Amino acid sequence: VSTQQTVTWLDSEHNWKTLTADKLNLHYYSGTQAFAQDLLNAAKSGLDFNSTQSGLNAESPIDLYIFANTNDLRDAILYEPSWTGGQAFADHDIVILGISQSDLEWGRDAIVHELTHVLVGHLTFSCLGGVPTWLNEGLAVYSEGGLDPASQQQLDDAIKDDTLLTVRSLSAGFSEVPSKAYLSYSQSYSIVKFLIETY
């Protein structure tokens, strides 16, 4: 038996730089080091929040790949809805995001969101399937700190107009239609928030 070896493969399309802290490796090729450090700090805060709030901990180092924008991200992945800003691959401890310096505030939330998916994936592996989408996404939005005002308004309007989506429809994936997808995230957060605060 040979000793375990580690190989890191980086998309050779870009000249990647790396910052490391705790169990996080943040890879970026665009933006300043201060921008990357800000995102790394947000990821560290997300790890801390998930650990104390939900008992979700990183089992091994997680690699965060920051593309310069969502267009660059979409060029690197296939078959994702147009509203996709990031993806998590829990089996490989990888997060990919498209974050420009002008979207730093959104990026801080998005990095915590996707990082939460990796942590949930570690805790909930099953040969029978994954956790319901509403639970996974609801936990991720909860870890971000809650809904932004526009998302809260959309949820409030759906409650008022009796146009909420069924929980069953939130269990197996979200719509490719952006407005339905955004409502799906908001509803999922609302369900998870209720469960956490009630039980």
State what each model feature region is.
Residues 123, 130-173:
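Post-HExxH zinc-binding segment in Zn-dependent metallohydrolases
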Residues 116, 120, 140, 192:
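Short active-site segment of divalent metal-dependent hydrolases/proteases
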Residues 15-132, 161-164, 174, 178, ...:
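Juxtacatalytic substrate-recognition/specificity segment
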Residues 1-13:
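Beta-strand-enriched, solvent-exposed domains that form extended recognition/catalytic surfaces
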Residues 165-199:
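Pan-zinc metallopeptidase signature
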Residues 11-14, 77, 154-155:
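Alpha-helical scaffolding within the catalytic cores
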